[in-house]
Every structure is written in C-alpha cells, then in structure tokens.
Design a protein with these regions (language model features):
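Conserved active-site segment immediately N-terminal to the catalytic lysine
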Residues: 100-112, 122
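Active-site C-terminal subdomain of aminotransferase-like
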Residues: 112-198
Length: 281
C-alpha cells in the first residue's frame, strides 16, 4: 500500500527513512521547516494520487518548533478514505489529539515529553480495527497487533516489562490529573512560552517561526552574530543547559517550554542571558 508522508522537518524526514528501510512504497509532500503543512496541498496530493492508502505526518515538528494543523489534515485524509498515522511525540497530553474527533487511526508518543514521565517507554494509541486486524509487521519487536493480543485480556507484555518506567508513568499520570489535565498543562506550557519569548524579545532575540504556527512546546531563536559556544558555556555555568537547533542554514538555538518548569525559570534564564550579552563576550 502506498504511503503519503507529509513533512516539514527532521522528524518528518525520519519517517521517509523508516519507510525506505521497511520497503514501503511511498510519496512525499514537503514544506519548508518554518512553514506549517497546508491542508489544501494535502487534498490536492490525494486527488492527484488516488492510489495513496495511508497519510503520515508529525504533529509538533520540534525541528523548528511549529505545530501542524492536525485536525484539518486528518479530516481531509479521513474524508478521502485514507488511514491516518501521526507522530505526536511532543504534542500528546499538551494538545488535542482525539482519535475519534480528528479521524486518526493511530498515534505514537512517549512517556516523557508532555506527560513528564521517564523516556524509554513509547506507546501507540490506535483504533481496534487496526489492532485486531491482520499484522503486516516485518519486525517481531514492533508487531503491535501481536502485543495487543497479549495485553488484552491478560495485561501481559510479550517480553520482560519495563516495570520501573511503567511505575514512573503511573505517577506522572497521577500528577497530570492532579494538575488539572490537558487544559491546565496547556496553560502552564503557554505561560512558559510567553515568559520565554517576551524575555527574548526584550533582548532583541527573535524566533524564526511565524507566531500563527508557533507551538508552546519548543521555540527556535535566531542567534544572529552571537557565539553559541560562548553563550552555552555561560548559561551552563548559571545552571541552564540548552542545545543548538537542527536548522543548518541559520545560527539558531532551541529552548523547550515543557516539563516540570515554570515561568519564573524562564525569567531567570532571560536574566542570565541578558547579563551575558551585557558583558560584551
């Protein structure tokens, strides 16, 4: 079956590599890393290539920090009778990702990121139609249909279960509920993002993604002629560890606004950065 991979960043491009390694037939619809996926372009591609059976995309593309219009894209694909598979690694639990309401067949995410658990444990939320269907996996470990048959009704893993990570996830879910669930976490991450971008703006440092497409998960900033190595060393000495952006054509760096972090932390970060810039180094 032919896949349509819609990409606008490094993680969408990784899907292409995965499709190649799995020997899948695919076609690609690409956008600039600072431009959200255009639902109309997806519709046009589906009209031009009716043999496409499945549409794949990344919801929150952290290469640049933009959020793609998942509901609109999934709705178009579903209306055309396509299967919709989504990478929600950095959006699950912080953005709406309702399978039924959006028309998504399966999404993949992780216990860390917006759930604020530990990494290592990945999971898939999928329709019963897919999970109870015939497996087409070429990997024993990644055969989700087989794993599903073990989990229900007996609750078993096929292999040794990651007990420690599962317990950490359970605690993370308790804290998620205690905080107030999706709306409360969205509000905190948005407040983090606002504190960060406002502080950066005062320093003359701007983000590279247009505001209408910018997520509150991670933001990529244009460094201009600032030395990343020097800035990194100074911030690390002040207790902040950041990492460079994935964009190769610009001098950029990225800062995430998820995790057990609050606006006051970003205010302190911007204060430290201001001191570095004023030092003339």
């Amino acid at each position: 079956e032919k896949l349509l991979i819609v990409e606008n960043g490094a993680y969408g491009k990784r899907m292409i590599k995965q499709a190649e390694m799995a020997g899948k037939k695919y076609t690609v619809l690409s956008f600039d890393m600072c431009t959200a996926i255009d639902p109309k372009a997806v519709q046009k591609k589906l009209d031009e290539e009716p043999d496409i059976k499945t549409v794949m995309l990344v919801h929150s593309e952290t290469t640049s920090g933009l959020i793609n219009p998942l509901k609109e894209i999934a709705g178009i694909a579903k209306a055309a009778g396509k299967t919709v598979l989504v990478d929600t690694m950095s959006s699950f639990a912080a953005y709406e990702t309702d399978l039924k309401a959006f028309g998504i067949d399966a999404l993949a995410s992780s216990a860390n990121k917006c759930l604020e658990g530990l990494p290592v444990l990945a999971f898939v939320v999928a329709t019963k139609k897919l999970l109870e269907g015939e497996s087409c996996s070429k990997s024993l470990c990644l055969d989700l249909c087989d794993q599903y048959r073990y989990l229900y009704p007996d609750g078993k893993f096929r292999f040794t279960s990651p007990t420690t990570v599962l317990l950490a996830l359970r605690r993370a879910l308790d804290l998620y509920k205690l905080e107030g669930g999706l709306e409360a976490r969205k509000a905190r991450y948005q407040a983090n993002h606002d504190a960060l971008t406002e502080g950066m703006r005062r320093l003359g440092i701007t983000s590279i993604v247009p505001e209408k497409w910018q997520s509150y998960i991670i933001t990529t900033f244009d460094l201009g002629d600032i030395s990343f190595a020097d800035m990194y060393a100074r911030l690390k000495a002040d207790g902040f560890v950041i990492y460079p952006g994935k964009l190769t054509d610009k001098n950029t760096f990225r800062i995430g606004t998820i995790g057990d972090i609050y606006p006051k932390d970003y205010e302190r970060l911007c204060k430290c950065l201001e001191e570095y810039l004023n030092s003339g180094k």
